[in-house]
Amino acid sequence: MWTSWWLWPLVAVCAADQFRDLAVRIMQDTPVIDGHNDLPWQLLNLFNNQLQDPGANLSSLAHTHTNIPKLKAGFVGGQFWSAYVPCDTQNRDAVKRTLEQIDVIQRMCQAYPETFACVTSSTGIRQAFREGKVASLVGVEGGHSIDSSLGVLRALYHLGMRYMTLTHSCNTPWADNWLVDTGDDKAQSQGLSHFGQSVVKEMNRLGVMIDLAHVSVATMRAALKLSQAPVIFSHSSAYSLCPHRRNVPDDVLQLVKETGSLVMVNFYNDYVSCSAKANLSQVADHLDHIKKVAGAAAVGFGGDYDGVSRVPSGLEDVSKYPDLVAELLRRQWTEAEVRGALADNLLRVFEAVEQASNHAQVPGEEPIPLGQLEASCRTNYGYSAAPSLHLPPGSLLASLVPLLLLSLP
């Protein structure tokens, strides 16, 4: 017995290799669908969305968590690319900038057709898998991107948006964000306002996944109660393990379980360990916890790569997903549970959202009350009591008569 002590490290290495080999085999059949990647923001920040810039070559892009070789090494088969614009665009140029971020995602697919396939459905994801491409979908990160307009919501859907985060780190006029729970923002909607409920219903009608990352706990509960389809948290972790208000508390995880919804675990150190440093094992702890509380069907990956300043040791970039999967296998996750976390759980939710959609239903039309909007940079067409030039003949004159009478001496 004592003579074989020198074999122990070799046995440990072989066991580790065994789990990673199994992870690779699984991921060759079931590549990961990640819920949130901010590469489009980096393309704006570094290159002003100019993909022809030599430095923006996605095959050799440096200083980012994401490039094509890293995606291939990580067995990434599906990616929700974030069409993110900051909160300071709210009530200003949020819609314009969101359109530009959707455009750069679409141009990524056009520039690298051998790697990316822009798709808009669960069927499209499966087809991209078969072709060995990265199924590329648009997630709009923040309800401020629709400028409180159901019409803009519908337009973004037609441009390919398949999930929308109800808020970023700021309230919209119709939904409260996570900073309400820290006391840094004041609650405006107590979760969702009447118009916020209309947004959720219209997303259900269209077949857009409702994303509750970044929202307040009251907004989480309101949306989970109201939605007629499962929802997602595209990049959030477990509050019980790291009490950061961007994470999901256990009582909400119970609602996730009851509604067949999904939490895609974030890799940002501050949400994993509540400190500047974290490691791969701690990310696996979050996956374990969500599995324990909400069930294996409620777990996914939402790394938040290229949207955060620090990531865990062992998960330095998108190439490292197989190492995390190997850790789950070491923790005795079954192959079916691993395949669920990689892709099958997201596909199930997406298919349920598609099935719950009803394009034959009349679209939502009731606008948000003008008084709920910041009005300094907007017109009031449609809200105005001023006479319309498009009234029936005679109506304009009739509406002016009281004004003329008031002007008489």
Swiss-Prot record:
Binding positions (Zn(2+) 1): H36, D38, E141
Effect of C274G: Does not affect dimerization. Does not affect dipeptidase activity
Activity regulation: Inhibited by L-penicillamine. Inhibited by cilastatin.
Membrane association type: Lipid-anchor; GPI-anchor
Database matches in Pfam families: Peptidase_M19
Residues the entry annotates as binding substrate: H168, R246, D304
The protein's enzyme class: hydrolase
GO terms for cellular component: apical part of cell; apical plasma membrane; endoplasmic reticulum membrane; extracellular space; microvillus membrane; plasma membrane; side of membrane
SUPFAM superfamilies from the UniProt entry: Metallo-dependent hydrolases (SSF51556)
UniProt keyword Zinc present: yes
Disulphide bond pairs: C87-C170, C242-C274
Result after altering C170G: Does not affect dimerization. Does not affect dipeptidase activity
Protein's UniProt keywords contain GTP-binding: no
Residues bound to Zn(2+) 2: E141, H214, H235
GPI-anchor amidated serine lipid modification positions: S384
UniProt GO MF annotations: beta-lactamase activity; dipeptidase activity; GPI anchor binding; identical protein binding; metallodipeptidase activity; modified amino acid binding; zinc ion binding
Superkingdom of the source species: Eukaryota
Subcellular location: Apical cell membrane; Cell projection, Microvillus membrane; Cell membrane
Signal peptide location: 1-16
Any one GO BP annotation for this protein: homocysteine metabolic process
Catalysis: reaction(s): an L-aminoacyl-L-amino acid + H2O = 2 an L-alpha-amino acid; leukotriene D4 + H2O = leukotriene E4 + glycine; L-cystine-bis-glycine + 2 H2O = L-cystine + 2 glycine; a beta-lactam + H2O = a substituted beta-amino acid
Gene3D superfamilies: Metal-dependent hydrolases
Primary role: Hydrolyzes a wide range of dipeptides. Hydrolyzes the conversion of leukotriene D4 to leukotriene E4. Hydrolyzes cystinyl-bis-glycine (cys-bis-gly) formed during glutathione degradation. Also possesses beta lactamase activity and hydrolytically inactivates beta-lactam antibiotics. Independently of its dipeptidase activity, acts as an adhesion receptor for neutrophil recruitment from bloodstream into inflamed lungs and liver.
Quaternary structure and interacting proteins, as annotated: Homodimer; disulfide-linked.
PANTHER family assigned to the protein according to its UniProt record, in alphabetical order: DIPEPTIDASE 1 (PTHR10443:SF38), MICROSOMAL DIPEPTIDASE (PTHR10443)
Protein name as it appears in the record: Dipeptidase 1
Gene name of the encoded protein: DPEP1
